[in-house]
């Protein structure tokens, strides 16, 4: 489960992708975590924007005080879950990050591992949103991540962002292999 990530210079990283990013500053966050307002790419009829949105969805049907925000959705079951099946068809987004953390557990401790691209280009992660909240979509881990954790975010290639955000198209993506760092 992806529960922490790093994002630096989000405006700079998306300048060629989005039309507007007026509400987002080029800050650095080395410990992005659920409940924070984080930059995501949304698509509108007049173009894509970079917006700050809270990580963690409390579904509209849930009673907020009784419901823990959902930070991840499994790609394998996203069409079946009440919390997500409408959102994947109507409100897709893309989170921007430098890399993400996963923790390897042993009997004695948890050790953090940081995953990023070897070329240091940003990761564009598939997500969904509702109102002003979003969650990341995860998949089974690639071989390099699997040694640490059994899940990883669904990472889109740059040329897959437009297709993913196009609600007329089915969700598809290329599985990117990340090194362990």
Where does each model-flagged region fall?
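A short, hydrophobic C-terminal helix/tail in secreted or cell-surface proteins
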Residues: 177-181
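Short linear sequence motif anchored by a di-proline
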Residues: 1-176
